[in-house]
A protein has these predicted regions:
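Short, contiguous pre-domain boundary segments
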Residues: 1-20, 176
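Non-catalytic accessory segments flanking enzyme active sites
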Residues: 20-59
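Short hydrophobic core segments
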Residues: 30, 80-81, 106, 195, ...
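Generic structural signal for secondary-structure transition and capping sites
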Residues: 35-39, 86, 204
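Short Pro/Gly-enriched beta-strand edge/turn motifs at strand-loop
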Residues: 37-49, 120-125, 266-271
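Short clusters of hydrophobic/aromatic residues that line enzyme substrate/ligand-binding pockets
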Residues: 42, 88, 120, 212, ...
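Rieske [2Fe-2S] iron-sulfur-binding domain
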Residues: 47-153, 157-164
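C-terminal catalytic domain of Rieske-type non-heme iron oxygenases
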Residues: 146-148, 152-373
Length: 373
């Protein structure tokens, strides 16, 4: 090692070490401590409106179902028949996939059936007392129309405690009333933390998002330093939303403050929900890590039902603009992931204007420490 003077970079905060982004063993440890030990977001309840509507998704090797029961309640179950372990909804792909059961959930293997609330209904040619037998359940909770499940064997932390103060900052947005207008799924060859770190700072916005910075010049001023995410970031004069023109014919959400009608807000809810909020639409990102170097991202574009019900509704101005911005983000995140494989890379650094990205370092270390207790 060199005995020379310390590098000027040593005055900066360090990222997590290289292995945290690349190593398969570290990924497994981290995934168990975070994604299998607390609340994770799996989608929107407004996509499950009728009895029998379901969402099936595989989170790594854990397969689950979210089902709307006859009484209107949502339930979450492991996607596995009590008989021989068959998937009730086959998932060769991680999903999510959606569909509708008719009167019951029927296993495709031997036709064991279950009520929509998970209770065993029938076992062909077997006289089994169904009372007290049901699909394996898991905790489910909702906030703002978002559905969260928990894979932990025992978990007593309320969802509100996990979500933290961000919910109060978004209290005027009618999130529970919004509906999914369109969904785009991305396969990103980058560690999920690289994506979260990118979301948490705008130091990159000037070089990476020139079109976005035309709408929100504050994103590139001073490297994105001093942005007020609590109250939102102002658009340029005459602009009020994330579209190529910065304008739209869609009305602002009811209930917003005057500031929120002209400012953009962003909120991260660990570990896997990122929200970007304009006055007329919301881009909701769900991150589902597949491996140390691969993350599946679903982006739901949410609009007010009053707008969606119009015969001439067209959300493409927002969706196409967001798709451009997203592709720019995912491309640079993949470049980061490739670059970190170089043997000279030990860790990165956070510039002062990237202080929000420090959250991921604190969060991951905290969750790993909890798991090791």
């Amino acid at each position: 090692m060199s005995n020379g003077p310390p590098s000027p970079l040593e005055s900066l905060e360090k990222t997590l070490p290289q292995a945290s982004y690349l190593d398969a063993g570290e990924f497994q440890r981290e995934y168990a401590a975070i994604f299998e030990s607390g609340w994770v977001c799996v989608g929107r309840s407004d996509t499950l409106t009728e009895p029998g509507d379901y969402l099936a998704i595989r989170l790594r090797d854990q397969s689950l179902l979210v089902v709307r029961a006859e009484n209107g309640e949502l339930g979450a179950f492991y996607n596995v028949c009590r008989h021989r372990g068959t998937e009730l909804v086959p998932l060769k792909d991680p999903g999510p996939v959606s569909g509708q059961f008719s009167r019951s959930i029927v296993c495709p293997y031997h036709a064991w059936s279950y009520h929509l609330d998970g209770r065993l209904r029938g076992t062909p040619h077997l006289a089994i007392d169904a009372d007290g037998v049901s699909l394996h359940t898991m905790p489910l909770a909702e906030w703002g129309g978002f559905v969260f499940v928990c894979l932990a064997a025992s978990h007593d932390e309320p969802l509100a405690e996990t979500l933290g103060d961000g919910t109060a900052r978004l209290k005027r947005y009618p999130l529970a009333d919004l509906r999914v207008g369109q969904t785009i799924t991305y396969e990103v060859e980058a560690n999920w933390k690289v994506i979260v770190e990118n979301y948490n700072e705008c130091y990159h916005c000037g070089p990476i998002h020139p079109e976005l910075c035309q709408i929100v010049p504050a994103f590139k001023q001073g490297g994105g330093d001093g942005l007020d995410w609590d109250d939102g970031v102002p658009h340029r004069e005459g602009a009020n939303t994330f579209t190529a023109s910065g304008t739209t014919t869609r009305a602002p959400f009811p209930g917003l403050s005057e500031t929120e009608k002209t400012h953009h807000k962003g909120e991260l809810f660990y570990p896997n929900l990122m929200l970007s909020l304009s006055m007329d639409h919301v881009a909701a990102f769900y991150l589902w890590p597949q491996s140390a170097g691969h993350t599946r991202i679903q982006c739901d574009f949410l609009f007010h039902p009053d707008e969606l019900s119009k015969t001439d509704f067209d959300g493409s101005d927002a969706i196409e603009f967001w798709d451009l911005v997203n592709q720019q983000d995912w491309n640079i995140c993949e470049s980061v992931q490739r670059g970190m494989r170089n043997k000279v890379f030990e860790h990165g650094y956070y510039a002062p204007m990237e202080d929000y990205s420090l959250d991921i370092r604190r969060y991951v270390r905290g969750r790993l420490a909890e798991a090791d207790r």
